[in-house]
Amino acid sequence: MELWYTEKHTEDVKFSIRVDRELYTEQSKFQRIDILESKEFGRFFTLDGLMMVTEKDEFIYHDMIVHVPMATNPNIKKVLVIGAGDGGTIRELTRYKTIEKIDMVEIDESVVEACKKYLPKTACKLEEERVNIVYEDGLKFVRNKENDYDLIIVDSTDPFGPGEGLFTKEFYGNCYKALSEDGILVNQHESPYYEYYAKSMKDAHEKIQGLFKINKVYQAHIPTYPSGHWLFGFASKKYDPIKDLNVEAWKSLGIQTKYYNTDLHVGCFALPTYVIDMLNEDKE
């Protein structure tokens, strides 16, 4: 008997991967956690049936959510990561020796423990000495922070269930307050392609652009995410991700990446016309 993982992207579109075996399943206090193994994508991790990470393509997402802000301001010292229980974002951040402190706020400890055991490729740096893991609601955590971080990365799930509060105006306002005077906020911005995800993308962008001086959106192709076309939000009090990119400074760090490079850094902000039109709809 064949076993397949299937995720519904719309009422008329489904995405499937043949599964070799199920490694782990748990219904935590917050969500259902599954870790499966496949021939094509290696091990992969889902929450409430939705794809989070695969061993084969996780490098794309984690490269883009980390190295774009870090190349924009290589002097970042203090970082807050909200979500990111699989550890991939933390892994990439720890490659920067200049970072002094990484606070990771994850609501579900079960996710972290499962990923440590079954996804060591992403979770390999969660116990690094600069990393402080707090098991708490990210919305609640940032309420009490002011001028504490140079970079906040919102590596959240989709805007429902446990991650719903991380897409509110209150949350983004608290992130702004928690950032230093030249702070940067980066978040996963959903997909612009299917209507449901596009609405979430536009809602998040509208809330963020009312707060920050600089607001940009950039993109990557992630094969296992809905439509494959995925966006990230870049918001900053000071730094422009293109004008302030110092190519030589970043290259001098000697960080070897699999997806990100400084040419791509500039190019990923060149959006398709249909996405630009969506982002401008609320301005008209």
UniProtKB/Swiss-Prot annotation:
Residue span, PABS domain: 2-237
Enzyme class, UniProt record, top EC level: transferase
TM spans (from-to): none
Pathway(s) it belongs to: Amine and polyamine biosynthesis; spermidine biosynthesis; spermidine from putrescine: step 1/1
Pfam hit, one: Spermine_synt_N
Any GO BP annotation: spermidine biosynthetic process
UniProt keyword Nucleotidyltransferase present: no
Single annotated GO MF: spermidine synthase activity
Enzyme Commission (EC) number: 2.5.1.16
Active site (UniProt): D155 (proton acceptor)
Keywords, ordered alphabetically: Cytoplasm, Polyamine biosynthesis, Spermidine biosynthesis, Transferase
Binding-site residues, S-methyl-5'-thioadenosine: Q31, E106, D137, G138, P162
Compartmental location: Cytoplasm
Main localisation: cytoplasm
Positions of spermidine binding: H62, D86, D155, S156, T157, D158
One GO CC annotation: cytosol
InterPro entries in the cross-refs: PABS (IPR030374), SAM-dependent_MTases_sf (IPR029063), Spermi_synthase (IPR001045), Spermidine_synt_N (IPR035246), Spermidine_synt_N_sf (IPR037163)
Family, per entry: Belongs to the spermidine/spermine synthase family.
Purpose: Catalyzes the irreversible transfer of a propylamine group from the amino donor S-adenosylmethioninamine (decarboxy-AdoMet) to putrescine (1,4-diaminobutane) to yield spermidine.
Name this protein carries in UniProt: Polyamine aminopropyltransferase
Species this chain originates from: Clostridium botulinum (strain Alaska E43 / Type E3)
